[in-house]
Amino acid sequence: MTLPRIDHIGVIVPDLQAAIGRLSALLGGLAPQCRDLPELDLHIAEFHTANLVIELIAYSGPAAFARGVMGGESGLNHVTLAVESVGAALERLAQAGFVAQPGFPRRGAHGSVAFFERDPATGLLFEICAPEARKEQP
């Protein structure tokens, strides 16, 4: 059996530049890959570490869809599991009692994605994604 792989963790921040500065200092000066997703009213900064991607997320506008999915509170927001097929994973997880949020699967920041309703046992949002190839950090 292949071990599951956590693709990334998502952290909502109120001030992206301040959060980048703090995380960069913590990670020894590592620079993030930054991008804007205007269709979702999001600014994202990704720190690629040896074993995990830390995704800092800042809302850039009303973000009706993104806020509805992820909520507005700052802090650790979601844990994302990499899967080969979002459709197959949705079926498997539905049988285990996970409920996909309305509007998923869809294209997201990391390829095909699906968010689930907030987990009552952990308080976290879980996301699955079939990641596209990422650019390597310089």
Language-model region placement:
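A short beta-turn/loop motif at secondary-structure boundaries
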Residues: 37-40, 71, 106-109
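Vicinal oxygen chelate
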Residues: 1-2, 6-14, 45-48, 55, 67-87, 90-138
